[in-house]
Amino acid sequence: MAQHTVYFPDAFLTQMREAMPSTLSFDDFLAACQRPLRRSIRVNTLKISVADFLQLTAPYGWTLTPIPWCEEGFWIERDDEDALPLGSTAEHLSGLFYIQEASSMLPVAALFADGNAPQRVMDVAAAPGSKTTQIAARMNNEGAILANEFSASRVKVLHANISRCGISNVALTHFDGRVFGAAVPEMFDAILLDAPCSGEGVVRKDPDALKNWSPESNQEIAATQRELIDSAFHALRPGGTLVYSTCTLNREENEAVCLWLKETYPDAVEFLPLGDLFPGANKALTEEGFLHVFPQIYDCEGFFVARLRKTQAIPVLPAPKYKVGNFPFSPVKDREAGQIRQAAAGVGLNWDGNLRLWQRDKELWLFPVGIEALIGKVRFSRLGIKLAETHNKGYRWQHEAVIALASPDNVNAFELTPQEAEEWYRGRDVYPQAAPVADDVLVTFQHQPIGLAKRIGSRLKNSYPRELVRDGKLFTGNA
């Protein structure tokens, strides 16, 4: 791989020399930072098994190298990246994989280590969604996830990725993460705080990442991180697991934040060592049991991960002063819910007891049961999945429900050719050589649901959402 020139402030280099263990070479650190980052992907096991994904992509000539800490993660090398971006492949468009940096798969691996099986999880700083979607896959779409994002512009991206990956057990919120300790005390079995940070570990992806770096800004960021971890710790139930992570390398934003929490609540914080998380984890292990990943250790981004347990309750915070407002949804009565479920099954949409039907005017929604305890405590940006809109002739089923709930083996499923699937993703109607019999058609490609269509004569009317329509070269190579 070609070198690229990274900007390093002198004070940063001094700080890294002091922070780096004697077992590591500073020259190796500098050399690793100058190398471009290896691409990596994570197979979305909600949609496809790793074995089936490897079989499906075998003809493409991709070189996939397993990532030690994530069974479904792979470093990827491919010859046609310039000709066809990874995000324009059919497998990405249908949610079979997520483009995710290898080291950012570590926090979720830590969250579920040692057989941990939380039922209600919070991702405090969730956008663009790599870790939320990874958590959902580990939970197999069961239980409930509260995915929060402070940046309003990033909430939309977060929802798009959750929808593409077929996730149904997520509620989205848009808050400063510092509110949750007071708003939802002791409500979560597990919390991931991938904290905003100075980004010192991302120079391989962004050579100018340190242009605005200063020791003073590190201290300001660390102060915010302490407030965030304190809030998250209050929201965690006794016995629950908190994973704290950053993509930065200084101790101030990493070890010091976790040690501050332990000093603040000495009887309630237990550090859970990560030395056995995966073979070779001990190479990045700190004396506290955290993973401090310098980029040369595993040839990835710089990263930090700590795992801790809340061993006992701590004093609650004063209740927040903001008003949540009225919740505009009401549960659907059992008899009507049965009729809706039957109609949905007719087009291949099915769900289990983890989801419950709610209604707002003519809209039908499915909410994860595990999130209901939070209703009235926080205001949701989006909750669960929109199933349908009712109208005089029945139901207008929604695209995100199809992606999350449809079975490709449904009697109304119709498999497209590669050329037809590409037309579908471009938002165009499809004219198959042999038209399906049913009027409501579950459109599939590679045996994956990609939408619903109305058959009008020999034409399949496209219902792919306008905001998802793709231009440019797609997977058949045609522009």
Curated annotation (Swiss-Prot):
Compartment(s) where it occurs, according to its Swiss-Prot or TrEMBL record: Cytoplasm
A single MF term (Gene Ontology): rRNA (cytosine-C5-)-methyltransferase activity
CDD domains: AdoMet_MTases (cd02440)
PROSITE patterns linked to this entry: NOL1_NOP2_SUN (PS01153), SAM_MT_RSMB_NOP (PS51686)
Enzyme Commission designation: 2.1.1.178
Pfam family, one: Methyltr_RsmB-F
Coiled coil: none
Record Gene3D superfamilies: 3.10.450.720, Vaccinia Virus protein VP39
Main localization category: cytoplasm
GO BP of this protein: rRNA base methylation
InterPro entries xref list: Methyltr_RsmF_N (IPR031341), MeTrfase_RsmB-F_NOP2_cat (IPR049560), MeTrfase_RsmB-F_NOP2_dom (IPR001678), Nol1_Nop2_Fmu_2 (IPR027391), Nop2p (IPR011023), RCMT (IPR023267), rRNA_ssu_MeTfrase_F (IPR023545), RsmB/NOL1/NOP2-like_CS (IPR018314)
Keywords for this protein: Cytoplasm, Methyltransferase, RNA-binding, rRNA processing, S-adenosyl-L-methionine, Transferase
Reaction(s) this enzyme catalyzes, per UniProt: cytidine(1407) in 16S rRNA + S-adenosyl-L-methionine = 5-methylcytidine(1407) in 16S rRNA + S-adenosyl-L-homocysteine + H(+)
Gene Ontology cellular-component annotations: cytoplasm
Top-level class of the enzyme under EC nomenclature: transferase
Record SUPFAM superfamilies: S-adenosyl-L-methionine-dependent methyltransferases
Residues forming the catalytic site: 247
Positions that bind S-adenosyl-L-methionine: 125-131, 149, 176, 194
Function: Specifically methylates the cytosine at position 1407 (m5C1407) of 16S rRNA.
Sequence similarity: Belongs to the class I-like SAM-binding methyltransferase superfamily. RsmB/NOP family.
Protein name stated in the entry: Ribosomal RNA small subunit methyltransferase F
Organism of provenance: Escherichia coli (strain SMS-3-5 / SECEC)
Lineage, broadest ranks: Bacteria, Pseudomonadati, Pseudomonadota, Gammaproteobacteria, Enterobacterales
